[in-house]
Structures are given as structure tokens and as C-alpha cells.
Amino acid sequence: MTIAKGGKNVYGAAVGILMLESRFPRIPGDVGNATTWPFPVMFKVVPSASPERVVLQGPDGLQSAFIEAAQELVRTGVDGITTNCGFLALFQDDLASACGVPVASSSLMQVPWVQAILAPGKRVGVLTVSAATLTPAHLTA
């Protein structure tokens, strides 16, 4: 016999995805296309967090909006959170502290691990929309 516990508004979507405000096509395979995932996900678009603002100008001033959106996803029922923008690595610690669920804010979090397993003299390659604004802080957050 299975006993069901309550406490969530929504069940069955364990992963929440914080999304930048954008209008470009999200084809299958893109994090922002629900058909990419072999399981249900829940999306939350963060108001005023455009790619231009986050990537080119920097995310300063958007931290509270991302925390609020992440907390809303948790209240709704997700058990973990990720984002659709690697530049959000800068918010990793703040999001993880504020949410109470696992948070993976950026695929850039994997760079130190990948570098550690490479042979000496080899380097990790990173594809980015803006090399000019990708800083060492993004890679060590």
C-alpha cells in the first residue's frame, strides 16, 4: 500500500527551469523546449531578465527576481532547479541558499571538474554567446 503525502500544489514536475525573457525559437533539444526532457518540467520566466541584460550588461539588480522566481517554483512543487543561461553561474550560491532544493544554475559549474579529469596540458573548451563578458568569476562560481 502506498501512502500519498500532501504539501505541494503540483506533482510530477520535479525539475524547475528559470528562463530568461526571450522570443527566439526553442527547438527540441533546447532547455526551453518542454519536449527536450524525457520527464515533465516546470518553467518560470524571470521578468526583466533578457539575454541582453544578463549576458551583455551583467545580472546586477536581478538577483532578487531570480530568487523569488526560484522560490515560487519550489512552493509550486519542484524538487530541483536549473536555468537556461550559463551566465547565471554568478547566482549559484544565492539561489542554492534561498531555495532549500538542489540548484544547478549553469553548465559552467562543470568546467573545474572536467579540467581536473583532463590530461595535463589539455584545456576545457567553452562555447559562449559572449566571450567578451564571460569572466573567470563565471567559471569559479
Residues covered by each model-derived region:
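Short, well-structured alpha-helical segments in soluble
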Residues: 61-77
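Short coil/turn connectors at secondary-structure junctions
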Residues: 11-14, 38-39, 99-100, 120-124
